[in-house]
Amino acid sequence: MKKVAVMNDLSGFGKCSLTAAIPVLSALGIQCCPLPSAVLTGQTGYKYYHSKDLSDMIPLYTDAWRKNNVHFDGIYSGFMTGPEQINHFLDFIDTFYKDDTFLLTDPIMGDDGETYSIYSQNLLESMRILSAKADLITPNLTEACLLTGDSFQQVTGYSDRDSLVKATSEIGQKLREQSGKNQDVVITGVKCKNDSKPYIYNIAITEKGIFTNKSHFFDVSFSGTGDLFASVVCGCRINGVSTEDSIKLASSFLYHSIADTMKDDTQPEDAVNFEKFLIELIK
C-alpha cells in the first residue's frame, strides 16, 4: 500500500488537518502516516482551546522512521507552528524525499488578506524555502501573495474575472520560477466580487498552462475545507491522476460536503459533513 507522511496538527474538534487527511487518504487507498505538528483540544476557531507544540518530536519521528527504513510515496505538509518546526521538517524532507516521492505543501499563513496569529517574517522566510522544494503547493490567494511579495489588495481589486485570473496566474508563475523546478501551483479560494453568480475559483498554473476550476461559492467559511481539498489533490496525484482532474474531484467532493452541511445548523468551526461523501473518492 502507498504511504504518505502528513505533517499537520491534530485537533479534537473541528474536523481539520490530520482528522481530515486521514479519512480522505484512506478512502483513496493510501496509508496516512501522521506526523503531528501540534495537538489541540479543538481547532483555533473555537472560543476556548488549549494546544501543545510538538516541534521537539519531529527529530524523534525522523530518527525512528529512518532506522525502520521507511519509504514514503508522498509527503504532505500543512499547519506549522513556526520557523523552528519548519526547519525540523526540512531535515525530515532531506531524509525521506526521494526521486519517486511526491511532495505537497499547503503553506498555511493566513486568509482573506489577513495573517494568522502564528505568522512572522521568520515563518514566511522558512515557508518560502519549504514551498520551493514542493512538487505541488496549494496556497490560497493571501498566502500566494505573501510568498511572492505581491499586494493582495491590488490583485483582489480587479472587478472582472479575466483580469483577476490573469493577475492570479502571474503570481502562480512567479511561484513556479521561485521553486526552480517543474512545480504545479494551485491557488485556491479565489473570489471575483463582480461575478453574476457566486463562484469560487481554484487556479492551477502548471507546465501545461493555466487551468481554472469554478465551483459554487457558499458565503460561510467552514473549518477544514482547505485541508480536505489539499488531501484529495495529494492522494489523487500520488495515484497518478493529473493535477487538473485532481482539482475537479476535490471541488466536487467539497461542493457536496458543504451543500449538505448548509442544510442544518452546523457552526463554521464544527466543519463540514464530508464523511458520507467519502464514497466519491473510492474507486
Language model features by range: what are they?
Residues 1-105, 109-117, 275-282:
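Conserved N-terminal subdomain of the carbohydrate kinase-like
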Residues 60, 129, 170, 245-253:
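A non-catalytic, amphipathic alpha-helix used as a structural packing/dimerization or gating element
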Residues 118-210, 241:
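Conserved phosphate/ATP/ADP-binding segment of small-molecule kinases
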Residues 244-283:
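Charged C-terminal helix
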Residues 12, 210-224:
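Short pre-catalytic strand/loop immediately N-terminal to key active-site residues, enriched for Gly-Thr
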Residues 146, 220-243, 247:
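Short, small-residue alpha-helix embedded
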